[in-house]
Amino acid sequence: MKTQFAILLVALVLFQMFAQSDAILGKIWEGIKSLFGKRGLSDLDGLDELFDGEISKADRDFLRELMR
C-alpha cells in the first residue's frame, strides 16, 4: 500500500511538472510568434513609453528611506 501511494505521488508530481511546463512553453512560443509576426516589429514602439529615464526627487527620497 505504501509503494502504491508513493508511485501515485510521484506520478502526480510529474504530471504537474509536465502540465505547467507545457503552459510556460506555450506562452513563450506565443511571445516569439507575436514578436516576429507581420506587425510584431512595428508594435515595439509602444514599449518606449514604459521606460522613464528620469528619477524624480520623490523617488530618490523613497530610495534613501529604503536604504536606511
Curated annotation (Swiss-Prot):
Primary location recorded for the protein, binned into one broad class: secreted
Site features described as Important for antibacterial activity, and hemolysis activity, chain residue numbers: 29
GO biological process: defense response to bacterium; killing of cells of another organism; monoatomic ion transport
Localization: Secreted; Target cell membrane
Molecular function in Gene Ontology: toxin activity
Reported modifications of this chain: IsCTf is an enzymatic proteolytic cleavage product of IsCT by the proteases present in the venom.
Top-rank lineage group of the source organism: Eukaryota
Transmembrane segments: none
Gene Ontology annotations for the cellular component aspect, listed alphabetically: extracellular region; membrane; other organism cell membrane
Similarity field: Belongs to the non-disulfide-bridged peptide (NDBP) superfamily. Short antimicrobial peptide (group 4) family.
Protein name according to UniProt: Cytotoxic linear peptide IsCT
Organism the protein comes from: Opisthacanthus madagascariensis (Scorpion)
